[in-house]
Amino acid sequence: MPYYRAVGEIPRKRHTVFRRPDGGIYAEELMGEEGFSSDSSLLYHRFLPTAIVKTEPVDVPPDLVGTTPNMPLAPRHFRTQELTTNGDMVEGRRLLAGNGDVRIGFARTDVPSGLYRNSVGDETVYIQSGSVRFESTYGVIEAGEGDYVTIPTGTIHRWVPHGTVTALTIEASGHIRPPKRYLSSYGQYLEHAPYCERDLRGPSGPLVVEGEEAETATPVLVRTRGGLTRMTFAHHPFDVVGWDGYLYPYAFNIHDFEPIVKKTHAPPPVHQTFEGPNFVVCSFCPRPLDYHPEAVPIPYNHHNVDSDEFMYYVAGDYAARAGSGIDIGSISLHPAGFTHGPQPGAVEASLGARETTEMAVMIDTFRPLDIGPAGRESEDPNYAWTWAR
């Protein structure tokens, strides 16, 4: 995170004695990235965060593995509206696509998740519809439609939906951050950035479980590069009375993104919202369109020779895909090796348009995306030929 926050009770100096009301000492825990060389936060626990009483292996659900190459190479259309789903926001995810850098999944659920810690990398979860309470050792974030919730590696958390929630899950192999070009050398958002610190929502207060539950042994599902482990802590891990630092979960709503408009059509990098290891996340939002009198206000045909384009259509009308079968909830995958662009007739139909209502989340990856079980299950077999109609 690019700025400092302090929540709850903390001592004036770090690494000093901080006493509980009963005279004991709070247990200090450093959550830090890149071996003490990057962002970190200090958390103060009522109980030892190191106290575990049991570990056991957990089989990885079949739907979270088993990607296959996009072969024969083709553009794809996944219809998430037709996916069968069960389980919660963690164990009920359906894997759409992935590679060694990022895994992209889909969840639709009204079931609270168990406690979970992803120790492989950061996650960003986009809430397509519904609302959910995100609980973690850092506190609570209430998230709803249009929110990106970004979760640092190693954060113990759970999801508690308020009714049915639909979400796109982005699991990185490293850290997800604001683009470097939006930040000063000291981490402040610059004036040209399409969003800033005021748009970000972190936990506003600690979440401390009280009573008998606090002292009950509590299981946490832990994901590492080696697989899944059920780790049972001696006490409930939601025992943090305060924390401070630059590393914490936060929410950013897509409606707070400030689109950049040019005289002629602007390329996707102007919509960039986050960056991860070998991928970027972009937000396409309602906006005025290009204002040159002869402008073509939809994308030109383009061949991204170094990246695959994964686009989740979340609201509005995406004019470039008119007639393709793409609808709200659809996903297009346009891989490197294929030139893509507007559907036939879309250019002519767009001329003279002054604004767009489109809203989409795009993930560009710089290594090829393989297709997951949910992608295969939901694929429209006719999409690749729609430009030839």
Pin down the residues of each PLM region.
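Jelly-roll (double-stranded beta-helix
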Residues: 1-389
